[in-house]
């Protein structure tokens, strides 16, 4: 093990740099490009190697970012790697993260933490047992819009939260993704794929969920792949619900309707709205780091808070023609800061586990048509203040 960590003390790293967390990326597919590109923004992390089930893909990413392409086992044994960034497909998240923890590495994984809450609990327990940190996407709630919304909520801008809505609706993945099959199998679907952005933001703003009720259906049993690629004009069988309506009861007493559907052509619902005893708050798409947060105090006109000029809110993606803020890697940088100072990371495994338990409860309720308790709980992550957010930059 390359690390000695106690939450009362600071991390010791024995790698190339005593001040940077050495990152080894496993999984070099679509999402990896964002993380690899954004790594240079942050001072506490350093890319060192990458691996993929496809050696060619690993070599491509390595050549693009000036790092080594090596095998998975070699990466896990490499003393220069302090943290494994797990960007594999959801079905592989548990095995790769457990292997990394077993090798003495800290872990940050793409969402979901695992495809079952039982596996998620095992990962969180394994990290704790070994004195390692595990973090998980999404980290979008740490972006400019998420921080603004959290400050407003903490300041009592809407009073006591009473109710709200959250909607993720679209036509699914087969229209743009060349290999969309895994999105439509257990562990995929709109709740597991997109739900983490919405649910993580809601837990960040309202605290933990206590109980859910849901209905779940499939708009189609088969779907036609129209995206360019090897599977264009072929069909895939749907193995998980694609249209889910749920009611979330938070431990605070607030209730939120959460709808997630890949069976919608067009809609006009706002991504998230929260309503309290003193006003209402409207949030942008929680899959991005920026966008406009709007506040109405006691029925007054909406007051907009744009994010473009704020840290981790400026539009930077896609790089050729930016139309949204994408600072994936921010959660990894926050975890590096946690290791350096002895605090807990904000985009933590515990937070991701609670979100995973909520999602599992939603799908279970969708099957049983009864209410399902969310037995686990988590503390709201502490607000990422503006000064601390700036210290994460290179």
Where are these regions (language model features)?
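Short acidic low-complexity segments
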Residues: 68-77
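Beta-strand-loop-alpha-helix segment that lines the small-molecule cofactor/substrate pocket
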Residues: 13, 83, 89-141, 156
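Glycine-rich phosphate/pyrophosphate-binding beta-alpha loops
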Residues: 259-268
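N-terminal Rossmann-like dinucleotide-binding module
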Residues: 2-65, 393
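C-terminal glycine/acidic-rich active-site capping loop/insertion
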Residues: 6-8, 221-239, 245, 250, ...
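Core-facing hydrophobic residues within beta-strands of well-ordered domains
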Residues: 45-47, 81, 161, 209
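Short glycine-/small-residue-rich Rossmann-like dinucleotide-binding loops
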Residues: 80, 88-89, 260
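Predominantly a Rossmann-like dinucleotide-binding segment in NAD(P)-dependent oxidoreductases
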Residues: 140-237, 369
């Amino acid at each position: 093990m390359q690390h000695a960590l106690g939450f009362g003390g600071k991390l010791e790293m024995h790698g190339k740099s005593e001040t940077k967390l050495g990152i080894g990326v496993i999984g070099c597919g679509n999402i990896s490009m964002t993380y690899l590109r954004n790594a240079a923004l942050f001072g506490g992390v350093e890319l060192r190697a990458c691996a993929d089930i496809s050696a060619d893909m690993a070599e491509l990413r390595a050549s693009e970012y000036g790092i080594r392409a090596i095998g998975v086992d070699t990466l896990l044994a490499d003393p220069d790697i302090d943290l494994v960034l797990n960007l594999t497909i959801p079905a592989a998240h548990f095995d790769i993260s457990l292997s990394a923890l077993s090798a003495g590495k800290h872990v940050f994984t793409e969402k979901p933490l695992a495809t079952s809450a039982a596996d998620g609990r095992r990962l969180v327990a394994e990290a704790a047992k070994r004195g390692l940190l595990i973090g998980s996407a999404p980290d979008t709630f740490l972006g400019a819009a998420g921080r603004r919304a959290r400050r407003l909520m903490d300041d009592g801008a809407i009073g006591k939260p009473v109710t709200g809505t959250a909607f993720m609706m679209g036509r699914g993945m087969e229209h743009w993704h060349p290999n969309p099959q895994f999105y439509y199998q257990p562990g995929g679907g709109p709740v597991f794929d997109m739900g983490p952005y919405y649910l993580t933001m809601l837990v960040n703003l309202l605290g933990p969920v206590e109980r859910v009720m849901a209905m779940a259906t499939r708009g189609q049993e088969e779907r036609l792949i129209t995206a360019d690629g090897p599977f264009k004009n072929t069909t895939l069988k749907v193995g998980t619900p694609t249209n889910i309506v749920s009611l979330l009861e938070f431990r605070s007493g607030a209730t939120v309707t959460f709808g997630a559907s890949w069976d919608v052509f067009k809609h006009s619902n706002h991504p998230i709205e929260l309503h309290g005893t003193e006003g209402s708050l409207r949030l942008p798409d929680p899959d991005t780091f920026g966008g406009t947060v709007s506040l109405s105090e006691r029925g007054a006109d909406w007051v907009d808070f744009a994010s473009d000029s704020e840290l981790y809110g400026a539009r930077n993606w896609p790089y050729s023609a930016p139309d949204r803020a994408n600072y994936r890697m921010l959660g990894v940088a926050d975890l590096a800061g946690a290791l350096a100072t002895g605090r807990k990371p904000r985009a933590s495994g515990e937070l991701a586990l609670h979100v995973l338990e909520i999602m599992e409860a939603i799908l279970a309720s969708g099957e049983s048509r009864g209410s399902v308790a969310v037995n686990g709980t988590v503390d709201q992550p502490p607000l990422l203040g503006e000064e601390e957010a700036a210290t994460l930059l290179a």
